[in-house]
């Protein structure tokens, strides 16, 4: 006889464990259990049957894998948590005795330090794994870098997040790894490519943040502890691959003055000593060269001139080989039936030097931090701003002639409303000349900040006149959403997106609406006049009423007349079939009548009949489109009859989604059409 299997020893009851059982098994508190799970990357699971997994009738809410909890039993951090618990008991005992100094000494000298280095190595065995998990880390650290310091968010945490984020930005600037950016309601999205991995993160706008009390900052602080360690490892590895010393030199005084990115100085690993040695050899060689006679120097110059032609040829050959090696690779399919890959149209080096030849000046109202980061990431070396925005600028003088582009984010105002010229900040030779706000310096291009984002997303310099101060900006679209067929594209014109006959139908509908409004207005006037006449008649005929206010039944003659009217109204199906021909004959008659009237008046017929011809063309075009659409629907229905039920259902779903998309696009096009016509008026 087979042994009876005991309940709860296999299946879901064995594979899952509740949170209460896990806390008891690990012998730690619930907050420490949460921190440990966040550090180790263990998350709650959802069993198929909660009652079977809980081994009782009461369904628990949180479950974990039993193997995960068994894995946590060997974690070295458990000992740190237990030491912290024992230390807290000692501190509480000292405070109970009134020994405050002993409690402070215990907390200062015996507090266990948590190190997460081994957890980073366990969770990310390769560097590519760490890069793939960097999106959430960057988003959270940039968020904490812009938060105000409170009791829940200490200043040390904010300073650490700011330092790590600026170090990561410096790597992107040096390597030109930033690819795209997008301004959204939530914040600014960035995308960078590091070692073939696309990393996207969100940076909030620098508004005044109001910290709410419903946010659990203890959980977020745990994630910050883990992500700061992760980003520190990643920055060290990235700097090491470039041969840079990590951490970079940080100027605290400059950072206090608002330098931000300029407060960091990148240094090569053991490069400074070599440069000094080279400089020393240059100095010794320069002193030795003084002793060389002029005759020897003249002979050397002759040799260089004689070999100049061959040298230029060699240089040209080297440049040609370099240009040939720097060409963009073409992805050709291996077989004719293979998929065709998208061909790159621009290289990373070309995109990284997009703003290299320009000198930018950021006005006070423009966001300095994101603009400086993007401009430096795309090759710009000379960026100036007002001294109010902080240190680290190429120039603080707005009248500097080297400035080629100025970023302005204020509306164009008349000269009378502009404020007076502010006083200079310094006196003497180093005084910075102030410019009246709103003035334009000749020889300089003025643009709005959106021009920077649209240029880097397109990979080329766009027309600056479309982004001039006070101009209506083009639509700023996400670079990660590509336009699909049938969807509305705000960058394209209406003529490119409209379907066949859509514009004529819309114009006809607008004319009908305007005619209806005019008819309603005239009918309203007629109704008011009739109401006044009827009121006067009622007042006159009140005494002459014969029926005494009672309804009188109709006679037989009235019934016969009503039947004859009904028969006259229904003309049969032949009349409906011949309605189109009668309409054409009527329109021809009216047109001939208008020609005669125009001839009698001595006017050309084209001016008097332009409106009628346009309406006739529009109505005929609408009829053609409707008939064509009806034929296509009939043909589609015939094709659907030959399909199986499964394919027919799938086709109906596809048609439904396409119809919804086309209806939404039609609504947006009609809205845009009305706005454009309103702007023309």
Swiss-Prot record:
Recorded GO MF terms: ribonucleoprotein complex binding; RNA binding
Keywords for the protein's UniProt record, in alphabetical order: Coiled coil, Nucleus, Ribosome biogenesis, rRNA processing
One CC-aspect GO term: nucleoplasm
PROSITE patterns: BRCT
Chain spans, region Disordered: 489-681
Entry annotated with the keyword Coiled coil: yes
Pfam families given in the database record: Pescadillo_N
Composition bias, Basic and acidic residues: 522-533, 587-597, 630-640
Localisation per UniProt entry: Nucleus, Nucleolus; Nucleus, Nucleoplasm
Biased composition (Basic residues): 617-629
Membrane-spanning segments: none
Organism domain of life: Eukaryota
InterPro entries for this protein: BRCT_dom, BRCT_dom_sf, PES
Family named by the database record: Belongs to the pescadillo family.
Known role: Component of the NOP7 complex, which is required for maturation of the 25S and 5.8S ribosomal RNAs and formation of the 60S ribosome.
Protein's name in the database: Pescadillo homolog
Organism of this sequence: Aspergillus oryzae (strain ATCC 42149 / RIB 40) (Yellow koji mold)
Source species taxonomy: Eukaryota, Fungi, Dikarya, Ascomycota, Pezizomycotina
Gene assigned in the entry: nop7
């Amino acid at each position: 006889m087979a042994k009876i299997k005991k309940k709860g020893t296999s299946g879901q009851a064995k594979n899952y464990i509740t949170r209460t059982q896990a806390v008891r098994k690990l012998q730690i508190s619930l907050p420490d259990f949460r921190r440990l799970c966040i550090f180790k990357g263990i998350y709650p699971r959802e069993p198929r049957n909660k009652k079977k997994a809980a081994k009782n009738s009461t369904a628990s809410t949180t479950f974990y894998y039993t193997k995960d909890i068994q894995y946590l039993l060997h974690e070295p951090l458990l000992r740190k948590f237990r030491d912290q618990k024992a230390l807290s008991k000692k501190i509480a005992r000292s405070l109970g005795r009134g020994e405050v100094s002993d409690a402070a000494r215990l907390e200062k000298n015996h507090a266990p330090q948590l190190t997460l280095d081994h957890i980073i190595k366990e969770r990310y065995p390769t560097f590519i794994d760490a890069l793939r998990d960097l999106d959430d880390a960057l988003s959270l650290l940039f968020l904490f870098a812009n938060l105000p310091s409170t009791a829940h968010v200490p200043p040390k945490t904010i300073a650490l997040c700011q330092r790590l984020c600026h170090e990561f930005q410096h790597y992107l600037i040096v390597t030109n790894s930033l690819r795209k950016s997008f301004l959204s309601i939530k914040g600014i999205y960035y995308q960078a490519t590091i070692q073939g991995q696309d990393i996207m993160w969100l940076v909030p706008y620098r508004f005044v943040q109001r910290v709410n009390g419903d946010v659990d900052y203890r959980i977020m602080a745990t994630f910050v502890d883990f992500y700061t360690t992760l980003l520190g490892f990643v920055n060290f590895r990235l700097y090491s691959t470039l041969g840079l010393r990590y951490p970079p030199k940080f100027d605290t005084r400059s950072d206090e003055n608002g330098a931000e990115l300029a407060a960091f100085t990148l240094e090569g690993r053991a490069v400074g000593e070599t440069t000094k040695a080279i400089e020393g050899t240059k100095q010794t060689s320069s002193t030795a060269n003084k002793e060389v006679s002029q005759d020897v120097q003249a002979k050397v110059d002759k040799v260089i001139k004689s070999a100049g032609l061959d040298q230029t040829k060699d240089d040209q050959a080297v440049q040609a080989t370099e240009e040939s090696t720097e060409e963009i690779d073409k992805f050709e399919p291996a077989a004719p039936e293979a998929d065709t890959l998208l061909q790159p149209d621009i290289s990373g080096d070309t995109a990284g030097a997009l703003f290299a030849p320009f000198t930018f000046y950021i006005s006070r109202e423009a966001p300095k931090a994101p603009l400086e980061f993007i401009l430096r990431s795309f090759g710009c070396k000379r960026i100036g701003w007002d001294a109010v925005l902080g240190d680290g600028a190429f120039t603080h003088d707005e009248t500097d002639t080297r400035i080629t582009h100025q970023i302005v984010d204020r509306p164009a105002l008349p000269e009378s409303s502009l404020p007076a010229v502010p006083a200079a900040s310094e006196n003497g030779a180093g005084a910075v000349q102030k410019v009246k706000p709103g003035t334009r310096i000749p020889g300089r291009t003025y643009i709005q900040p959106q021009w920077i984002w649209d240029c880097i997303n397109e990979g080329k310099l766009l027309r600056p006149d479309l982004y001039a101060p006070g101009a209506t900006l083009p639509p700023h679209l996400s670079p990660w959403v590509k336009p699909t067929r049938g969807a509305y594209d705000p960058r394209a014109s209406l003529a490119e997106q409209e379907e066949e006959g859509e514009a004529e139908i819309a114009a006809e509908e607008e004319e009908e609406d305007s005619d209806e409004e005019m008819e309603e207005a005239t009918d309203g006037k007629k109704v008011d006049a009739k109401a006044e006449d009827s009121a006067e008649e009622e007042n006159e005929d009140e005494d002459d009423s014969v029926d005494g206010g009672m309804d009188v039944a109709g006679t037989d003659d009235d019934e016969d007349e009503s039947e004859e009217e009904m028969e006259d109204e229904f003309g049969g199906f032949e009349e409906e079939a011949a309605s189109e021909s009668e309409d054409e004959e009527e329109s021809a008659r009216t047109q001939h009548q208008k020609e005669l009237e125009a001839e009698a008046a001595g006017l050309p017929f084209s001016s008097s009949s332009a409106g009628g011809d346009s309406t006739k063309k529009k109505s005929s075009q609408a009829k053609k489109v409707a008939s064509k659409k009806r034929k296509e629907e009939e043909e589609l229905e015939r094709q659907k009859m030959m399909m199986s039920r499964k394919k027919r259902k799938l086709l109906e779903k596809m048609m439904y989604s396409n119809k919804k998309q086309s209806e939404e696009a039609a609504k947006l096009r009609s809205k845009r059409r009305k706005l454009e016509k309103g702007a023309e008026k």
